Regions:
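Subset of outer-membrane beta-barrel
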Residues: 1-233
Length: 233
């Protein structure tokens, strides 16, 4: 695998109506070859000057969830700290909040999640000495990247239904609408909001063995001749 994904979590109830939890996520690519020092001062290629570095995103999340007094309703809140590291070249710290609401009735589950509701900010610290080692590309001098990265709020609406069959078989069907408040190349896109539908299935046997499949990432891809082509994954 090119990328590594690691996850750990802990949760426990506070009382019969609420619970809290913490989680740690790492998503990174390790052992990337750094060839910025490949050529020595005399213009000779020296492979011993190649080093390796990792780029990784870390997410620490504190979560709280509670059932509401209205039957079937429950909500949750995430407070998250984000750490991003690109070798010795740059690193950043960020923070943000997510909120979610769920409703269950007659075996149907409905959900609304607002991600990065306050806008998530990542403030970068860039190693200018390492950046200056990068060569010019096509005679163009590279500008130092901006030090603040902004993640705008997103919304996600979902619905699911569990179907149980004879002999311990079950099927969970779910559909999501993932919304970004900007224009993208999603199949449904306006100047105000872009919507990416997703459909998923989960087959289970005795709630022990699970098999998942799904469709998503519906987009209008721009081809080499500037025409658009519909695609999905």
């Amino acid at each position: 695998n090119i990328a590594n994904y690691d996850y750990g979590a802990y949760a426990e109830p506070i009382d019969p109506e609420s619970a809290w939890g913490v989680s740690l996520i790492r998503f990174g690519v390790d052992d990337i070859l750094n060839t910025s020092d490949l050529i020595d001062e005399d213009g000779n290629i020296d492979y011993s000057r190649i080093s390796k570095f990792s780029t990784a995103d870390y997410g620490f999340t504190f979560s709280y969830a509670r059932k509401l007094k209205v039957p079937g309703f429950q909500y949750g809140v995430n407070a998250k700290i984000i750490r991003r590291v690109i070798g010795d070249f740059a690193n950043s710290w960020g923070f943000g909040f997510d909120v979610g609401l769920q409703f269950e009735r007659n075996g149907w589950n409905y959900g609304l999640m607002l991600r990065d509701i306050t806008t998530t900010y990542n403030v970068w610290n860039i190693n200018e000495d390492e950046f200056d080692k990068l060569p010019e590309i096509g005679g163009i001098v590279q500008d130092l990247p901006q030090s603040t990265e902004i993640t705008l709020p997103k919304a996600q609406i979902g619905i699911s239904k569990q179907f149980d069959f004879h002999y311990d078989y079950g099927l969970l069907v779910a559909m999501n609408l993932n919304m970004e408040f900007t224009k993208t190349n999603d199949y449904i896109a306006t100047d105000f909001v872009s919507v990416a539908p997703a459909l998923g299935f989960q087959f289970d046997y005795t709630k022990v063995v699970f098999l998942r499949a799904g469709f998503g990432n519906f987009q209008n891809e721009v081809q080499l001749d500037n025409s658009e082509s519909f695609s999905f994954q």
